[in-house]
Amino acid sequence: MTAAQAKTTKKNTAAAAQEAAGAAQPSGLGLDSIGDLSSLLDAPAASQGGSGPIELDLDLIDEDPHQPRTADNPGFSPESIAEIGATIKERGVKSPISVRENQEQPGRYIINHGARRYRGSKWAGKKSIPAFIDNDYNEADQVIENLQRNELTPREIADFIGRELAKGKKKGDIAKEIGKSPAFITQHVTLLDLPEKIADAFNTGRVRDVTVVNELVTAFKKRPEEVEAWLDDDTQEITRGTVKLLREFLDEKGRDPNTVDAFNGQTDAERDAEAGDGQDGEDGDQDGKDAKEKGAKEPDPDKLKKAIVQVEHDERPARLILNRRPPAEGYAWLKYEDDGQEFEANLADVKLVALIEG
């Protein structure tokens, strides 16, 4: 080795040593504390700030076995999932789902809401889905979410209310929890214990309107045989209009003959007597007049023949039902003026409007 070659080798060795020493020293930029960046490549990608959605492997996600929507919910039908799946396949999931950590199986997640998007993603052959992690989530939150999207059937709502009542919660507390009126809760509670014929009509889809079901139950309590016979007619359409006519017919049929009619001011007995008088000829007319003259009394102008208490509930006009015993102190039965629905309500939610003569 010549002197020049030895000098060059020594310089290269020194440069290499200096480079190694420099690599071992902190950069001064704080980057040395990061470690191996390759270890981050396999972690879920979160948005800046750590509060945005992450991309979760679908195989790590489970549906909530206690979610309010049941297997026969229309949104879970094969056609519905295929429809949303086709959209996801073409455009992806635009709105992240919400999940919480599975406390029983660390590393896995349970869906809070977004089961249809989850199923649609699997249908579309996706491997992952954008998701928010929200561990502060309960069944009431799921119900609220689905109520706002109109994705719960009346039966699913009723089943949730039934579970909450079984826990010892009061109807008023449940109403506040899900942002609904007490009347809404009462109407759906009725679905939990329907008479057999009405239950059949509801479960088979002949009637889906909760208000109509409640109207049928009210009529059934008064005239069960007539309501059952009415429902036995499979060609009978069940709507608010037809049920209202049914109730009017049953009420008229079972009305006390001494009830004063609000339109003509006569009792049914007086009306029938007048009709009979007209058929009996002159003698009958005279006898009727004599009987009326003997029993006639001057009406007291300070007394109401029939008092009607007009109120307002949920910004809808209603009236108090004075001849029905309330379920508890502070409650009363009301009847809406627009559709004739009868229901029990907390008097704290009722506004007195007027007292008139019927």
Curated annotation (Swiss-Prot):
Comp. bias intervals (Low complexity): 1-42
Compositional bias segments (type: Acidic residues): 275-285
Q: Which CDD domains match?
A: KorB_N_like (cd16398)
Biased region (Basic and acidic residues) positions are 286-305
A Gene Ontology cellular-component term = chromosome
The yes or no answer to whether the keyword Transcription is present is: yes
Q: List the disulfide bonds.
A: none
Q: Which UniProt keywords apply?
A: DNA-binding, Plasmid, Repressor, Transcription, Transcription regulation
Any one GO molecular function term = DNA binding
Chain residue ranges for the region called Disordered: 1-79, 256-305
- SUPFAM superfamilies cross-referenced by the UniProt entry: C-terminal domain of transcriptional repressors, KorB DNA-binding domain-like, ParB/Sulfiredoxin
Question: What GO terms in the biological process aspect are recorded for it?
Answer: chromosome segregation; negative regulation of DNA-templated transcription
Q: Name one Pfam family in it.
A: ParBc
Please give the NCBIfam families that the UniProt record associates with this protein.
Answer: parB_part
Family to which this protein belongs? Belongs to the ParB family.
The record describes the protein's role as:
In conjunction with KorA, inhibits the transcription of the kilA, trfA and korAB operons. Is also involved in the negative control of the kilB operon.
The protein's name is: Transcriptional repressor protein KorB
Origin species, per record, is Escherichia coli
Q: Which gene encodes it?
A: korB
